[in-house]
Amino acid sequence: MTQVAKKILVTCALPYANGSIHLGHMLEHIQADVWVRYQRMRGHEVNFICADDAHGTPIMLKAQQLGITPEQMIGEMSQEHQTDFAGFNISYDNYHSTHSEENRQLSELIYTRLKENGFIKNRTISQLYDPEKGMFLPDRFVKGTCPKCKSPDQYGDNCEVCGATYSPTELIEPKSVVSGATPVMRDSEHFFFDLPSFSEMLQAWTRSGALQEQVANKMQEWFESGLQQWDISRDAPYFGFEIPNAPGKYFYVWLDAPIGYMGSFKNLCDKRGDSVSFDEYWKKDSTAELYHFIGKDIVYFHSLFWPAMLEGSNFRKPTNLFVHGYVTVNGAKMSKSRGTFIKASTWLNHFDADSLRYYYTAKLSSRIDDIDLNLEDFVQRVNADIVNKVVNLASRNAGFINKRFDGVLASELADPQLYKTFTDAAEVIGEAWESREFGKAVREIMALADLANRYVDEQAPWVVAKQEGRDADLQAICSMGINLFRVLMTYLKPVLPKLTERAEAFLNTELTWDGIQQPLLGHKVNPFKALYNRIDMKQVEALVEASKEEVKAAAAPVTGPLADDPIQETITFDDFAKVDLRVALIENAEFVEGSDKLLRLTLDLGGEKRNVFSGIRSAYPDPQALIGRHTIMVANLAPRKMRFGISEGMVMAAGPGGKDIFLLSPDAGAKPGHQVK
């Protein structure tokens, strides 16, 4: 029977918007999607959401490296991420971004409530500062020699050689990763979230029994070592949300990132025109269930900071955190040089999504264990389980039903007791899906598949088909096989969405959890078409080789306006205000005798004439074409004596040089002498 319908909100950790989705990411999104699809099959109201984590120094700097704006970069990355997840049939109801108006408003609301409730503290701290880039440096943007083992080229927070942790100020000969400059110490006022105030609440939440044992044990270690106030602010320049009433101060990315769960759900509610559900799911006394699927590397933020922030701002806490381990490939950490650091899009160029969904699912449990993607075992397991056991069960029976009985199944079950064995397994398999013991569910299903194939082997329909007068037996045997295939595919529906679609088309019926209680009797199926193809190691070899080639391509130097000509050191507004930019009319333009680079421009500033030499001859070989145009000039630049005369200012142009120089022009309506403000 269908259970009492629950309201469930499910999230995956937000992928960072500075890189592509890879197979490590896909473990979590597949795990969550399988669980969500099962919940939907059982009749629950599930909202499944995600978003890109789109703020922080790494995004700001990478955008500069690529020569584009952060907004452009995260927009392009969001499209790529959504394409990858759609390719793996991750059934999100909404995919959003933390760089959104919903997230800004919610971040400001939560911060304001925390501040009003006395949980935000201010104090001055000393940090390493890059004097060339004019920015404070996060720990991972400082490198130097480890103070413990003296290994060179180590990050500012921990040594990858000896494992020591330390402050970036302890590094020997520290250097900025951004500019290579030697950082200096500078003071800055920062805002801190008073996490220790929530220690008692968090310990009670830990002891509630809802969290995984491994998570609860780790949290206990943190409680014993003492909780510390959490720095939630960063100084400009920073790509993120500015803190209310604190010019030049921005929310640290890890403050607004989890709020992105709320922002994405708010966006979904607004799209639906639903003004009720947001509060229904997030209010303090909500009876809806909230689950976060996350990796073990971000447990600290989700088990301490996030529930404390919610508690302190009068929102509900998560029902539970579902934490998983990492992905290794062929028994080792994913490697770019070995071609085992595989992007999601690269995988889909060589294999279908269902194959990886099945392999990951078969290995997952409710524990925080790492999952190894052994590529040879992957090929063998997909072929043995999906092709040989499940799909083959349909193909070896469908031919007889289609050819001999016009696709119509028998009106009675050949073996009702065997069918009951299959349907009785729904409770055990359902509980395994519910409790995220996915590997157990797959083992139970494959044991049934073995039983089904044994039945067909023993009944030998290919022999019966040759015996006169046994048409009814043949129809009954093959109908039984197809009904067992239907039950198996129903149990596998959360895992194999594309194969399920093809199976439903063949069976001519939708696969539902409760529907298997009634077998298909006297039912007409459609002509059988191949449901799934075998895979082989040649595809694996091509996949690995393609991943290696992508690494080579990614290592190629980045070019672009900002990459080739980086933004100069930050200036103050007072410095900028000294530059007087004016609209000027080009009254005359001519070549300069003796120069192959310069044009002589006569400019009208609306009552004052200027003579300006400009190095734009390569871009404007016909100077007469410039006469009558409006442009922008620096009007208060000191006159410069040149071999050809005195230049009384500078016209503004963009471009790398040579023929690629583009004179700037104001919009129509601007008049000579107008100041540019």
From Swiss-Prot:
GO terms for biological process: methionyl-tRNA aminoacylation. Pfam families: Anticodon_3, tRNA-synt_1g, tRNA_bind. Gene3D superfamilies: HUPs, Isoleucyl-tRNA Synthetase, Domain 1, Methionyl-tRNA synthetase, Zn-domain, Nucleic acid-binding proteins. Binds 1 zinc ion per subunit. Keywords: Aminoacyl-tRNA synthetase, ATP-binding, Cytoplasm, Ligase, Metal-binding, Nucleotide-binding, Protein biosynthesis, RNA-binding, tRNA-binding, Zinc. It is an enzyme of class 6 (ligase). Its EC number is 6.1.1.10. A motif ('KMSKS' region) lies at residues 333-337. Its cofactor is Zn(2+). ATP binds at K336. Residues 575-677 form the tRNA-binding domain. SUPFAM superfamilies: Anticodon-binding domain of a subclass of class I aminoacyl-tRNA synthetases, Methionyl-tRNA synthetase (MetRS), Zn-domain, Nucleic acid-binding proteins, Nucleotidylyl transferase. It catalyses: tRNA(Met) + L-methionine + ATP = L-methionyl-tRNA(Met) + AMP + diphosphate. Belongs to the class-I aminoacyl-tRNA synthetase family. MetG type 1 subfamily. HAMAP family: Met_tRNA_synth_type1. This is Methionine--tRNA ligase. It comes from Escherichia coli O157:H7.
